[in-house]
Amino acid sequence: MAKQKALQAIRGMNDCLPSETNIWQMVETVLRRVASNYGFAEIRMPIVESTALFKRGIGEVTDIVEKEMYTFDDLNGDSLTLRPEGTASCVRAGNQHGLLYNQEQRLWYMGPMFRHERPQKGRYRQFHQFGLEAFGIATPDIDAEIILLTSRLWRELGINEFVTLELNSLGSNEERANYREALIAYLLEHEELLDEDSKRRMHTNPLRVLDSKNPQVQEALTNAPKLSDHFGEETQTHFDTLCARLDAAGINYVLNERLVRGLDYYNRTVFEWVTTTLGAQGTICAGGRYDGLVEQLGGKATPAFGFALGIERLVLMLTELEKVTNIRPQVDAYVVILGDDAQVAANKLAEQWRDQVPEIRLQCHCGGGNMKKQLKRADKSGAQIALILGDDEITQEKVMVKYLRGQKEQESIEFTQVSSLLSELI
């Protein structure tokens, strides 16, 4: 019989191995804690949604909907899509369960998203996002508070010196429509300098031309009209107030009038946190205001503001900056078991110690072997100590402690002292 070919993960959809999950768990813990610090509650949405949700929510002429969604028909013939982002799903859930109308809600979520992109460093077809959304607040104080929240994330992760905040306002729908006409007129005058993608976008989503990565296109935009020239008093006051709040809080930012975001639902404030440590894929967090999306998806008109960040990019950044330190090993203490009496007693003792110190990561050796083999396993596990149980130790109600990290001498302690020792390891 021919040998079966080993199956592989789908391109762009990666396994997260035990050597990496400790970093992920550390990042996720910080994200959850900071969201909770600001009064946000977790919401969990399905991975699969109706395709119509994303077409209506994200916009039919966006790259995500046109090129990147994983869409299929189920057995009933319904068109379903693996979620490419979380905001539309969060709004759908809020509308469906009556969470949004005439209420203030602060929600966060975390989980896998899917886009059929060309896999590259920091960009994958299955990727994980942390998202945070605030509903029911139209004033710029929530814009400022959420940006402050993101700034706190970077400080807690130790990367605040390596990120830059870029800020812009897209104005209201009416202001943007007026600007769109002026921009199209300008682009038509300079059409010969545009690449094919920008020529297509000029007629479908002209603001996205501002976001082009083509240097020739950017040069052509040098004298393009500015969106800010079309702002009314209300929009300008909103943005000025936000900037004043950030200034007062000591948050540095760069005004970037070509920052437009890739999703159609944004209005007024948009922002990105960018870094040079990831090369071309430099955005690690982005968001803004989307006051029309709730109504667009069938709810009552509700102001909203939120952001999402890519966890893979964040983990990659932390790793490249060597900020991944003091991560607790998978095992704190390893129980070495030698002799028949020790085999009988070890599990009961280990259960007692786990009861006494619930946070301890205590692993008992399984599979037999002499002391040398077991100590080798203990060292490989990352444990700080080995608790050696032999028949003599069981009789004397003692355990031999071997310190696997550092120079401390081996010692014998009473069973009753073990819980205190384990507590020191946490």
UniProtKB/Swiss-Prot annotation:
- Alphabetical list of Gene3D superfamilies matching this protein: Anticodon-binding domain (3.40.50.800), Bira Bifunctional Protein, Domain 2 (3.30.930.10)
Q: What class of enzyme is it?
A: ligase
Which GO terms of the cellular component aspect does the record hold? cytoplasm
Where does the protein principally reside? cytoplasm
Q: Which GO terms describe its biological process?
A: histidyl-tRNA aminoacylation
Q: Which residues form a coiled coil?
A: none
Q: Does the keyword Chloroplast apply?
A: no
Name the EC number(s).
6.1.1.21
What does the UniProt keyword field contain?
Aminoacyl-tRNA synthetase, ATP-binding, Cytoplasm, Ligase, Nucleotide-binding, Protein biosynthesis
Its annotated compartments are:
Cytoplasm
Q: Which InterPro entries does the record associate with it?
A: aa-tRNA-synth_II, aa-tRNA-synth_II/BPL/LPL, Anticodon-bd, Anticodon-bd_dom_sf, His-tRNA-ligase, HisRS-like_core, HisRS/HisZ, HisRS_anticodon
Recorded GO molecular functions are: ATP binding; histidine-tRNA ligase activity
The reactions it catalyses are: tRNA(His) + L-histidine + ATP = L-histidyl-tRNA(His) + AMP + diphosphate + H(+)
| Quaternary assembly | Homodimer.
The record's similarity note reads:
Belongs to the class-II aminoacyl-tRNA synthetase family.
Give the matching NCBIfam families: hisS
Listed name of the protein: Histidine--tRNA ligase
